[in-house]
C-alpha cells in the first residue's frame, strides 16, 4: 500500500483492532468513518487519542484503523493498544514513555464466565435461613 507504513494489533476484552500508521496530517479513520462519527462518546475519543497526545504526534500521523468485536469501551481500548504498538514500530525510542504511561501492557481483564448454581459469575441466590 504505502512505502512508510507501520502496523500494530491491539486487543481489549473481546475487541481486536488493526492499526496502520503513516506520515500525514492527523487524520484518523476507523472502519471507513471518522473518529467523531465512529465514537459518539467523548471519553472513547479521548482514550483513542491518548498515546498520540503523549508523544505529541497528533498532527504528524494519519491512522487507518479496522476494529471488530466487543463494545465501545473495549474497541477504544483495543485501538489505543494498537496505536501504541504501531508507534513503537515507527520509533522504538517512544517505548519507555509509552510503557511509563501504561499503554504498552495489554489489559488482560475479561468477562468472568457464569457458574452453574449462581445467577451470574459471582451473584448467589438469596440465602434463606429457615
From Swiss-Prot:
GO terms for molecular function: RNA binding; structural constituent of ribosome. GO terms for biological process: translation. Keywords: Ribonucleoprotein, Ribosomal protein. InterPro entries: Ribosomal_Su5_D2-typ_SF (IPR020568), Ribosomal_uS9 (IPR000754), Ribosomal_uS9_bac/plastid (IPR023035), Ribosomal_uS9_CS (IPR020574), Ribsml_uS5_D2-typ_fold_subgr (IPR014721). SUPFAM superfamilies: Ribosomal protein S5 domain 2-like. Pfam families: Ribosomal_S9. One of its GO terms (cellular component) is cytosolic small ribosomal subunit. HAMAP family: Ribosomal_uS9_B. Belongs to the universal ribosomal protein uS9 family. PANTHER family: RIBOSOMAL PROTEIN S9, SMALL RIBOSOMAL SUBUNIT PROTEIN US9M. This is Small ribosomal subunit protein uS9. The lineage of its organism: Bacteria, Pseudomonadati, Pseudomonadota, Gammaproteobacteria, Aeromonadales.
